[in-house]
């Protein structure tokens, strides 16, 4: 259930009855402090200004029309005209009971949409590096959240699988008598890429052959298509190992590489010319956009076809957006691409809108993110200053987690230790990233991310096992517990219950904004509130069975919420730590 939405509806009706316009915004928010209640309606300021009256006067009139019987125990006006709403304990009890009867914890399903999510996007013939981490795991958390809410999500892994470099790679493989590329590991291809580039730059005859191979590949020659396909297959097989290690839901079926849009490009250029949007300029085909100005203050020219007939990333991105709307029938498209690509995407989408390829009713959203930095505040690198391979980073996470869990669990079996180390190590790397606002850069710090204190994966995983341990200690009759009422009489019980019931509101924000850090902050808050509740409200030694069972049910909803919340982030939980 979405309590915020319920209260917004009620306050909005009362505001309209008090003379506010029909489109008024009640601005119901979760209260920041306990003394301000559970929710606060802040919309009186803006509306009162329009009506030419004092906000407090409007708030008083709104209260005469506001019926929250059975929902709120107290409603009061604070400051210049804020309305503070305190939830009724009986209402909280009823909602906790409802949440426990459903696998979805009472989370309702919004109108189902088809949502395309573009994320990860590694390059062919190169190994994934830390630069791919943020897009991959933030995008996957968004996908998991949207799917949980009931949307039809299409994962789009926009792999870099086309371009002039393929002529160079095929020529080099051939020169090395390595046509049987299927037997090579990707680490070999990394070396091949470097060697091929060196040869291409230094040997004109080789470079000429590579250029000819590109033409043959692009014209659909069977042999060259087969060689190209081998390179793609080796890369994606290797990448799948990384995705599986990361507990990311991408599969081979989600690959929609640049090559997919290639056949569309000549038609796009011809159509943009026919619509008068693209013109010839110095031999190239260019779209001049008034929305973007160059240094001289003139409309910026965006090249969509070079003088030599080649296409650019912008052309591919135009085709890509068109395909996602026309062929995939997207109602919404999300792009998890770093912030440096923002202007490029905005230009492509401006052309897409002008050409009528995607209507304004279908949002194209750039959910950009900052960079991953080392402790020195510079881009995260190896000691030698090279790019950190993602597989190496995950190996190190696992090794550090092994040491950590072995130290804390000297008697655990080797199998159990390995499973636990995997959950903690991979979870720590992912959670450290997901818990930060994606729009900012963040410092990668092993010590912080593997700590058992603070907003970290190990702390959250431990908090979950701590709740489960209550049930292990209690000799519970499941049936008796299912039918037991929830009684909320203590402040800490009410605070925990109210926060647990804000799970749907949190999911809604993550789904709307693509901000997993909001879920991390929520779960951390729930864990903290449970800790206080556990300390001050005895569960197993409660004064009677009714109170004990009621508190066990609050603990049960806490465990289910933590598990489901961490699952939407792609963080594994464990039963014992």
Swiss-Prot record:
One of its GO terms (molecular function) is arginine-tRNA ligase activity. It comes from the Bacteria. Pfam families: Arg_tRNA_synt_N, DALR_1, tRNA-synt_1d. Transmembrane segments: none annotated. GO terms for cellular component: cytoplasm. GO terms for biological process: arginyl-tRNA aminoacylation. Belongs to the class-I aminoacyl-tRNA synthetase family. Monomer. This is Arginine--tRNA ligase. It comes from Salmonella gallinarum (strain 287/91 / NCTC 13346). The lineage of its organism: Bacteria, Pseudomonadati, Pseudomonadota, Gammaproteobacteria, Enterobacterales.
């Amino acid at each position: 259930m979405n309590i915020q939405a319920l209260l917004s509806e009620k306050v909005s009706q009362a505001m309209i009855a008090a003379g506010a316009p029909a489109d008024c915004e009640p601005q119901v928010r979760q209260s920041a402090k306990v003394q301000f209640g559970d929710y606060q309606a802040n919309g009186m300021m803006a509306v009162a200004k329009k009506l030419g009256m004092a906000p407090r006067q409007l708030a008083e009139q709104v209260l005469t029309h506001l019926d929250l019987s059975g929902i709120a125990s107290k409603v009061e006006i604070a400051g210049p005209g804020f309305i503070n709403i305190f939830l009724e304990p009986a209402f909280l009890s009823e909602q906790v009971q409802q949440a426990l009867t459903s696998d979805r914890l009472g989370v309702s399903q919004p109108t189902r949409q088809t949502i395309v999510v573009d994320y990860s996007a590694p390059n062919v013939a190169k190994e994934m590096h830390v630069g791919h981490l943020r897009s991959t795991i933030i995008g996957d958390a968004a996908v998991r959240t949207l799917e949980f809410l009931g949307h039809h999500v299409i994962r789009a892994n926009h792999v870099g699988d086309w371009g002039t470099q393929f002529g160079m790679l095929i020529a080099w493989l051939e020169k090395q008598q390595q046509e049987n590329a299927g037997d090579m590991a990707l680490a070999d291809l990394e070396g091949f890429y470097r060697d091929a580039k060196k040869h291409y730059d230094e040997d004109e005859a080789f470079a000429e052959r590579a250029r000819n191979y590109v033409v043959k590949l692009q014209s659909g020659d069977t042999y060259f298509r087969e060689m190209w396909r081998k390179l793609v297959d080796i890369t994606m097989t290797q990448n799948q190992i990384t995705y599986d290690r990361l507990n990311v839901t991408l599969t081979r079926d989600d690959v929609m590489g640049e090559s997919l849009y290639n056949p569309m490009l000549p038609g796009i250029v011809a159509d943009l010319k026919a619509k008068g949007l693209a013109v010839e300029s110095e031999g190239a085909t260019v779209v001049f956009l008034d929305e973007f100005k160059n240094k001289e203050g003139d409309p910026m020219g965006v090249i969509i076809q070079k003088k030599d007939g080649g296409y650019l990333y912008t052309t591919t991105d135009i085709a890509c957006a068109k395909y996602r709307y026309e062929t995939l029938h997207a109602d919404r498209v999300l792009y998890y691409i770093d912030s440096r690509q923002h202007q490029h995407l905005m230009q492509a989408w401006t052309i897409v809108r002008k050409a009528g390829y995607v209507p304004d009713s279908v949002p194209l959203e750039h959910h950009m993110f900052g960079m991953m930095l080392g402790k020195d505040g510079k881009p995260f690198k190896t000691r030698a200053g090279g790019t950190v391979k993602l597989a190496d980073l995950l190996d190190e996470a696992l090794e550090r987690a092994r040491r950590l869990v072995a130290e804390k669990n000297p008697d655990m079996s080797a199998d159990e230790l390995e499973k636990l180390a995997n959950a903690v190590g991979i979870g720590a790397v992912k959670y450290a990233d997901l818990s930060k606002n994606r729009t900012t850069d963040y410092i990668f710090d092993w010590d912080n991310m593997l700590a058992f204190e603070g907003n970290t994966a190990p702390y959250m995983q431990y908090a979950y096992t701590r709740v489960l341990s209550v049930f292990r200690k209690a000799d519970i009759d499941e049936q008796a517990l299912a039918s037991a009422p929830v009684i909320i009489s203590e402040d800490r019980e009410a605070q925990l219950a109210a926060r647990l019931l804000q799970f749907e509101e949190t999911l809604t924000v993550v789904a709307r904004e693509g901000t997993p850090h909001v879920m991390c902050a929520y779960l951390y808050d729930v864990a903290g509130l449970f800790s206080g509740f556990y300390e001050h409200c005895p569960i197993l030694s409660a004064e009677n069975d009714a109170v004990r069972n009621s508190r066990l049910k609050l603990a049960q909803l806490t465990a289910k919420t933590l598990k489901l919340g961490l699952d939407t982030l792609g963080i594994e939980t464990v039963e014992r730590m």
